[in-house]
């Protein structure tokens, strides 16, 4: 198969196999780091001879392990959709609060990413969802504007200090602080 358009060739392809020794490869001054988003992938790639994680993206943890919009968890009382309110209550029922659910789940995911590289740097990027992606999270539609081009819209650092997301960003910061100070991974930056 090739790219977006599959091609099938008749017969067997010729494969050349060579054994290479890495013993004589000189060390470089360039750090070789991996990029990861899925905490489970950290457990697959930890044996690679890398200098750490060059980019750990938290969006996967939020989307796959938390599943709800940070503002819906920071302010579940603001949810106008009764079904979303019920789902948030169900999702977070084992926690003291929906906010604690977010902080705990995010901290756990980040710690899982960081654990195999505990002795090396883990560079974490705070959330960078596009508005349409945030809107797809539980309770997210009511907290996100409709944008013609979400790729160029309200995302990244411009979102963090905005009153419409400031409390969600505070939850992200609490999770990172927990990872660094309570769980014990000060290598996460």
What are these regions (language model features)?
Residues 12-13:
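Beta-strand/loop-dominated core regions that host nucleotide or nucleotide-derived cofactor-binding catalytic loops
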């Amino acid at each position: 198969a090739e790219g977006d358009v599959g091609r099938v060739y008749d017969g067997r392809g010729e494969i050349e196999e060579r054994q290479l020794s890495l013993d004589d490869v000189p060390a470089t001054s360039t750090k070789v780091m991996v990029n990861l988003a899925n905490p489970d992938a950290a457990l697959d790639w930890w044996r690679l001879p890398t200098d750490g994680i060059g980019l750990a993206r938290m969006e996967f943890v939020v989307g796959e392990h938390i599943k709800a919009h940070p503002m819906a968890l920071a302010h579940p009382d603001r949810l106008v959709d009764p079904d979303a309110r019920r789902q948030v209550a169900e999702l977070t029922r084992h926690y003291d609060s929906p906010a604690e659910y977010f902080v705990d789940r995010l901290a756990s995911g980040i710690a899982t990413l960081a654990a195999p590289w505990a002795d090396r740097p883990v560079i974490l990027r705070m959330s960078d969802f596009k508005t349409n992606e945030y809107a797809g999270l539980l309770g997210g539609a009511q907290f996100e504007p409709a944008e013609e081009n979400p790729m160029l819209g309200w995302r990244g650092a411009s979102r963090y200090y905005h009153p419409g997301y400031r409390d969600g960003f505070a939850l992200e910061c609490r999770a990172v602080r927990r990872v660094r100070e309570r769980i014990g991974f000060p290598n996460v930056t």
